[in-house]
Regions:
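A charged alpha-helical hairpin associated with nucleic-acid processing machineries
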Residues: 52-53, 94-103, 130-146, 150-363
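Conserved alpha/beta enzyme-core scaffolds, especially Rossmann-like or related mixed alpha/beta domains
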Residues: 1-5
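Phosphate-handling DNA/RNA-contact segment within nucleic-acid enzymes
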Residues: 7-142, 146, 159-160
Length: 363
């Protein structure tokens, strides 16, 4: 930590010439173009150096010592510093994160400092932005257990929901995210000073909500799930969020939970979410397959491509549409036969079953 003196140009006492390109490019000096004046960005603030994961200083954060605004001020984004891709305290916390088996994300630098002073050195802070998808990627590389601690007021809950939304596309099976909300009158700094390390960690481990629980709690808030309208509203709001999740197991379980909440079969839910097409049973047809056929070069080329696609992805059979004017012979008849066989069952057969079915036929 350090201190930026009060005054407009304290850096001029240290750096000459003042200003210079390095000071302006790294954001330490601001140019007022209207008055053509230069002045220091950080004035009368406690200073926190921000390091990258290699320990190099890439920016600064400053906290006021009085009631001035903004309370926290960060270096602007520069070629070296991107707030959405860096976390305060990560370099210093890396060993403690490994030892604890978890990483804690808070909102302010002073929270990180206070927690470390009271024996919780595995905390990091976002840099004046909401937690981004890039932050989530970084956090998941550090630990399988990621805890977020937010103030219990409306602003804290809004920040928590933004963090959850940005986390959804990055989620991986085997990684767990948890959300702890402190009493409205506390932030992590004041809470640990009032209650100590043991009570803070007890709350962190036993009172935090896993992402899956917080997700449904937040989406269901204010909805009457005893009514069809409430259930449909939940479906509408949950669907685009669930679509962002690429973690197979977690995504499946969350959709299963949605089916339970709205009281429908998971298979029907999959259709509602647009993930499956209802099976279409088609009566088997028999097409003539003469050994000598009139050739239709363009259609035959397309038919051959579609046959290869069906053998690789049988579920695509529902998309096969042959115009009425096409003569069903040769490759087009083969395509029609294969598509009808695939659609005749409740689930698409694999390509081995397709080969076996047509083994001794002209198809």
């Amino acid at each position: 930590m350090g201190y930026a003196p009060d005054g407009w140009q304290p850096l001029a006492q240290v750096f000459q010439p003042y200003p210079n390109n390095a000071l302006t490019e790294c954001g330490q000096v601001i140019h007022n173009e209207e008055q053509n004046r230069y002045y220091d960005r950080f004035r009368h603030r406690i200073m926190f150096p921000i390091r990258d994961q290699q320990g190099r200083v890439i920016g600064f954060g400053g906290r006021v010592l009085d009631d001035s605004k903004p309370k926290y001020l960060n270096s602007p984004d520069t070629p070296l510093f991107d707030k959405g891709r860096n976390l305060y305290g990560l370099y210093e916390a890396r060993n403690a994160v490994r030892d604890a088996g978890r990483i804690l994300v808070v909102e302010g630098y002073m929270d990180v400092v206070a927690l470390a002073q009271f024996g919780i050195p595995y905390a990091v802070a976002s840099l004046g932005t909401s937690t981004t998808g890039e932050h989530i990627k970084i956090l998941m590389r550090q630990s399988d257990e990621i805890y977020f601690c937010f103030d219990g007021d409306a602003a804290g809950r809004k920040a928590a929901w933004r963090a959850l939304e940005n986390a959804l596309p990055q989620l991986k099976d085997g990684k767990s995210l948890h959300f702890l909300f402190l009493p409205p009158e506390h932030d992590p700094d004041s809470y640990i000073r009032a209650h100590g390390k043991t009570q803070f960690e007890d709350a962190l481990i036993h009172q935090s909500k896993p992402l899956s629980e917080y997700f449904w709690q937040a989406l269901s808030d204010g909805l009457n799930l005893a009514t069809q309208e409430g259930k449909s509203r939940l479906l509408k709001t949950a669907a685009p969020l669930l679509a962002q999740i690429t973690a197979p197991a977690l995504g499946f379980l969350l959709k299963q939970r949605l089916a339970e909440l709205v009281g429908i079969d998971p298979a029907d839910l999959a259709v509602l979410l647009g993930q499956e097409t209802p099976p279409r049973r088609v009566q088997a047809k028999s097409y003539k397959l003469p050994r000598e056929t009139r050739r239709q070069p363009a259609m035959l080329t397309l038919a051959q491509r579609q046959i290869r696609s069906l053998l690789s992805n049988p579920a695509w059979a529902v998309h096969v549409r042959l115009p009425e004017y096409v003569v069903l012979e040769g490759d087009t008849a083969c395509l029609a036969n294969i598509a009808d066989f695939i659609l005749s069952g409740s689930t698409p057969p694999d390509h081995a079953r397709i080969w076996e079915h047509f083994r001794d036929t002209d198809t």
